[in-house]
């Protein structure tokens, strides 16, 4: 995965954590259910993730653990 994608994902993960949620659980819910509500609006994370390639986000989550 490219550096820009990794940087954006780090920002999204940080925003989810700052909102008080488990980033892995929220991202897993996003990729399995396809619902953007799993991603917080904090830090503009929801808008950022919508601009990313869904398959890359899915791979990111699959490689998390």
Briefly describe each language-model feature range:
Residues 1-65:
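Intrinsically disordered, low-complexity, basic-enriched segments
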């Amino acid at each position: 995965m490219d550096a820009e994608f990794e940087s954006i994902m780090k920002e999204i993960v940080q925003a989810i954590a700052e909102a008080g949620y488990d980033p892995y659980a929220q991202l897993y819910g996003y990729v399995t259910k396809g619902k953007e509500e799993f991603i917080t609006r904090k830090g503009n994370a929801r808008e950022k993730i919508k601009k990313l390639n869904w398959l890359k986000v899915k791979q990111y989550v699959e490689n998390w653990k």
